[in-house]
């Protein structure tokens, strides 16, 4: 899909160098957007690949977004490079599996710092510029995990429920400034991490059978929804959660 108003749009993405985040970064680059992203691991090779493919190099800032000071500095650096942020995509997350009875206070705090706290403070950081501009779009990547009541990673599920509450609250608070805040809840997307750590033929087959649409979900299947919510095509949409899941939530 082509969204012509995204050309030269200044975009900031968390976790934009791998998995779904990399697909989102690439999609914006293909639209001609000016993309900056943060990630904890080195993404220089990915940036080289994108520059060669699109002649449009994303600006990579290496940092741990659970460190709010480092996150704020990253946003400032992106602003200095490309100008004020017009689109924020909160994407970075960690869905490591864990047991309720074994979760320590430190694990819980670390999980929430990455999966929820960083989302809030990245919103806070970019909102100042968006208020001044009287425009902006924030897209929070959530998950269908809380809608399904998934077991096996309760801290992550809790954070995703919180993301959706935060999305609605910020949409209401900042709509007066023509800032839109929405969330996307992907289904089980076959990233390299998922395939390496958690996918088995049996689990995948059972999941696909529950989807209304029987196709595997790939990172590229998520990106058009992100572009739509970033563009003026969705100018009357805010405070919403869009499930991109093949219909698995519909079947329960």
PLM segments and residue spans:
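Conserved glycine-rich Rossmann-like NAD(P)H-binding loop of the short-chain dehydrogenase/reductase
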Residues: 31-46
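Active-site helix of classical SDR
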Residues: 123, 159, 167
């Amino acid at each position: 899909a082509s969204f012509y108003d995204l050309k030269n749009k200044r975009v900031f993405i968390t976790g934009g160098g791998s998995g779904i985040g990399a697909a989102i970064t690439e999609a914006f680059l293909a639209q001609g957007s000016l993309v900056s992203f943060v990630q904890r691991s080195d993404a220089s090779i990915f940036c080289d690949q994108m520059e060669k493919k699109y002649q449009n190099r994303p600006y990579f800032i290496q940092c741990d977004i659970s460190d709010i000071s480092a996150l704020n500095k990253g946003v400032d650096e992106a602003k200095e490079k490309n100008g004020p942020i017009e689109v924020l995509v909160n994407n970075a997350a960690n869905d490591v599996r864990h047991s309720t009875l074994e979760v320590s206070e430190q694990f819980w705090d670390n999980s929430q710092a990455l999966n929820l706290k960083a989302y809030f403070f990245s919103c806070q950081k970019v909102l100042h510029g968006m208020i001044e501009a009287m425009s902006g779009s924030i897209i929070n990547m959530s998950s269908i995990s809380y809608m399904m009541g998934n077991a096996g990673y309760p801290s992550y599920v809790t954070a995703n429920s919180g993301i959706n509450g935060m999305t609605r609250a910020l949409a209401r608070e900042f709509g007066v400034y023509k800032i839109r805040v929405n969330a996307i809840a992907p289904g089980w997307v076959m990233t390299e991490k998922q395939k390496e750590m958690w996918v088995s033929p049996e689990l995948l087959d059972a999941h696909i059978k529950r989807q209304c649409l029987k196709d595997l979900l790939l990172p590229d299947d998520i990106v058009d929804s992100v572009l739509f919510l970033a563009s003026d095509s969705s100018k009357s949409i805010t405070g919403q959660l869009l499930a991109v899941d093949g219909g698995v939530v519909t079947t329960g």
